[in-house]
From Swiss-Prot:
Signal peptide: none annotated. It comes from Salmo salar (Atlantic salmon). It is found in: Cytoplasm; Nucleus, Nucleolus; Nucleus, Nucleoplasm. GO terms for biological process: exon-exon junction complex disassembly; nuclear-transcribed mRNA catabolic process, nonsense-mediated decay; positive regulation of translation. GO terms for molecular function: ribosome binding; RNA binding. Belongs to the pym family. PANTHER family: PARTNER OF Y14 AND MAGO, PYM PROTEIN. This is Partner of Y14 and mago B. Key regulator of the exon junction complex (EJC), a multiprotein complex that associates immediately upstream of the exon-exon junction on mRNAs and serves as a positional landmark for the intron exon structure of genes and directs post-transcriptional processes in the cytoplasm such as mRNA export, nonsense-mediated mRNA decay (NMD) or translation. Acts as an EJC disassembly factor, allowing translation-dependent EJC removal and recycling by disrupting mature EJC from spliced mRNAs. InterPro entries: PYM1, WIBG_mago-bd, WIBG_N_sf. Its main location: cytoplasm. Residues 51-138 are annotated as: Disordered.
Length: 192
């Protein structure tokens, strides 16, 4: 839809238009060289341009010849279009498996799901008593506390050097927790 322009002695205007609710829009002045968004051509890269310019038919074939060729192909018995015609071997195998599952019925799926649910719940005690998991968790906590302690030390250095003139409430809280972090780190290192 093109924008209706009106020209008079003072310049170019977009004409006053009526809104769906019945009110009128004011006419708007348009600067020289302005092109409305609807009229700006959409960017197309070279591949899009190539495929738009590419003919649908092979070179030398007319649209009438194409219709005849399609009718001849439909008449050939071996070219009947089936749902598996363009599929690979793997896709055909997967379709056969799906059909077998449908024929077996939903009972086998229910049994498989029940077995899958029962297996993980049978040994939750073994998972919590795993010593390597507990050691890994302690190592992770130690690493985390060392990181927090390093951040507190860096913050203290910045305050001492004057890089930070006034500490915020959160920064003061972090400095206040330094002793608790050190105690927790020492306790974890003694336990491991």
């Amino acid at each position: 839809m093109a924008t209706p322009y009106v020209e008079d002695e003072s310049g170019k205007y977009i004409a006053a238009t009526q809104r769906p609710d019945g009110t009128w829009r004011k006419p708007r002045k348009v600067k020289d060289g302005y092109t409305p968004q609807e009229e700006v051509p959409v960017y197309e890269n070279k591949f899009v341009k190539f495929f738009k310019g590419k003919p649908d038919l092979p070179p030398g074939m007319s649209p009438g010849d194409e219709a005849q060729a399609r009718q001849q192909q439909q008449g050939i018995p071996g070219i009947a279009e089936s749902e598996t015609a363009g599929l690979s071997k793997t896709a055909k195998r997967n379709m056969k498996r799906k059909e077998k599952r449908k024929l077996q019925g939903p009972d086998s799926n229910v049994e498989a799901l029940i077995n899958a649910v029962e297996m993980p719940t049978s040994n939750p005690a073994e998972a919590t008593n795993d010593p390597s998991g507990a050691a890994a968790e302690k190592a992770k906590k130690i690493k985390n506390l060392k990181k927090k302690l390093r951040q507190v030390e860096e913050l203290q250095q910045k305050l001492d050097s004057g890089e930070i003139k006034q500490a915020t409430k959160e920064q003061l809280d972090k400095l206040g927790r330094a002793k608790a972090i050190q105690d927790g780190l020492l306790q974890l290192e003694e336990d491991s």
